[in-house]
From Swiss-Prot:
Family recorded in the similarity comment: Belongs to the thiolase-like superfamily. Thiolase family.
GO biological process terms on file: cholesterol catabolic process; fatty acid beta-oxidation; phenylacetate catabolic process
Active site: C93 (acyl-thioester intermediate), H347 (proton acceptor), C377 (proton acceptor)
Gene3D superfamilies documented for this protein: 3.40.47.10
Binding site for substrate: G379
Binding-site positions, CoA: Q151, R221, E222, T223, S246
Substrates-to-products reaction catalysed: an acyl-CoA + acetyl-CoA = a 3-oxoacyl-CoA + CoA; 3-oxochol-4-en-22-oyl-CoA + acetyl-CoA = 3,22-dioxochol-4-en-24-oyl-CoA + CoA
NCBIfam families registered for this protein in UniProt: AcCoA-C-Actrans, PRK07850.1
UniProt protein name: Steroid 3-ketoacyl-CoA thiolase
Function: Involved in the beta-oxidation of the cholesterol side chain. It is important for utilization of cholesterol as a sole carbon source in vitro and for full virulence in the chronic stage of mouse lung infection. Catalyzes the thiolysis of 3,22-dioxochol-4-en-24-oyl-CoA to yield 3-oxo-4-pregnene-20-carboxyl-CoA (3-OPC-CoA) and acetyl-CoA. Also able to use acetoacetyl-CoA (AcAcCoA) as substrate.
Induction: Induced by cholesterol and repressed by KstR.
Keyword Transferase assigned: yes
Length: 391
């Protein structure tokens, strides 16, 4: 039996739709980050990519250039050792987080000693839902009679459930942008970012032959309450706008897991462990309210209360998702998404779970704290939850 620990974690910058990373093939983007996480760990230790036994990656839209087991294709595209196995999983927006649960589980079971959990979504190049085909009605049997709304309607139902107003979500959206701006100004993301070389595209999205080094998240916007108030709701009569919803984005992230004894034998310092993990089903009627349940589950498994948690990274799919969770669990909001979230930074869906774990780890280290909760809503009325502890 093994004892899984995180020894390295990194992510690409997040590019906005048709932005800085959109000229890069999805396999090149993920492969660059897979290689970066091993390189960063191996600089001091002599760890090599060939020491990795398995890679598990999350990807939501497994279609086109994200099909055919992208975790494996990306690994080979990056020139990494062919004997390393790879699997790609779809747990909707929780894919990248569930990949970490699975790799940690393999190590705990003694099946492997070294593994990478990662996530990718190049949403500029592979549109969300493209894998469903032209007739989305085929996804569900004719006998399906469950009220599972689309994500936009779900966000509005959650808002009504908790009495969340337009002003509430606008205030939250503004704060996400403010915190992200502060984080970048203070260099808080510098250690977790692996810069990416990407082709430059012209106005017709054609390569110019030039390349740029992308080292910063692109989605941050100058925002005011007045400006947010002028935005039109996505749904008529709704409260969510483009300023209070997650962005369509491109990005990848990777976390290197090892058995603790093996890590120490390589001269690597274990940085964090999983205290508790969960994947739960939530109420289909509300679809995206699952972080309420997954948080309760991991806190129960860990024997903790929300006040024991130092840092929370909860995905900002929509502002109401976070605000609903907060009204139930009553956290100190100064500990929640302290460096902004998907409203400001972006949400490359298959990547985000690994990105949140990466960000949470680095923020714990920056502030010399111990415990972080990472949670997300996911399509199909699912939610992932993880508590990690610094070692």
């Amino acid at each position: 039996m093994g004892y899984p620990v995180i020894v390295e974690a990194t992510r690409s910058p997040i590019g906005k739709r048709n932005g800085w990373l959109s000229g890069l093939h999805a396999t090149e983007l993920l492969g660059a980050v897979q290689k970066a996480v091993v390189d960063k760990a191996g600089i001091q230790s002599g760890l090599h990519a060939g020491d990795v036994e398995q890679v598990i990656g999350g990807c939501v839209t497994q279609f086109g250039e994200q099909s055919n087991n992208i975790s494996r294709v990306a690994w080979l595209t990056a020139g990494l050792p062919e004997h390393v196995g790879a699997t790609t999983v779809d747990c909707q927006c929780g894919s990248g987080q569930q990949a970490n649960h699975l790799i940690a589980g393999l190590i705990a079971a003694g099946a492997i000693d070294v593994g990478i959990a990662c996530g990718i979504e190049a949403m500029s190049r592979v549109g969300l839902g493209a894998n469903a085909g032209p007739d989305r009605s085929l996804i569900r049997a004719q006998s399906w009679d469950i009220d599972l709304p689309n994500q936009f309607e779900a966000a509005e139902r959650i808002a009504k459930r908790r009495g969340i107003t337009r002003e509430d979500v606008d205030v939250f959206g503004l704060e996400s942008q403010r915190r992200a701006q502060r984080a970048w100004a203070e260099g808080r993301f510098d250690r977790e970012i692996s810069p990416i070389q990407a082709p430059v595209l012209d106005e017709q999205n054609q390569p110019t032959g030039e390349r740029r080094l992308v080292f910063r998240d692109q989605g941050l916007r100058e925002t005011t309450m007045a400006g947010l108030g002028e935005l039109k709701p996505v749904l008529e009569g709704g409260i969510h706008t483009a300023g209070t919803s997650s962005q369509i984005s491109d990005g990848a992230a990777a976390v290197l897991w090892m058995d603790e004894a093996v890590a120490r034998a390589h001269g690597l310092t274990p940085r964090a462990r999983i205290v508790a993990q969960a994947l739960v089903g939530a109420e289909p009627y509300y679809h995206l309210d699952g972080p309420v349940q997954s948080t309760a589950k991991v806190l129960e498994k860990a024997g903790m209360k929300i006040g024991d948690i130092d840092i929370v990274e909860i995905n900002e799919a929509f502002a109401s998702v976070v605000l609903s969770w907060a009204r139930v669990h009553e956290p100190d909001m100064d500990r929640v998404n302290v460096n902004g979230g998907a409203i400001a930074l972006g949400h490359p869906v298959g990547c985000t779970g690994s990105r949140l774990i990466t960000t949470a780890l680095h923020e714990l280290e920056r502030t010399d704290q111990s415990l972080a909760l990472i949670t997300m809503c996911a399509g199909g009325a699912l939610s992932t939850g993880t508590i990690i502890e610094r070692i």
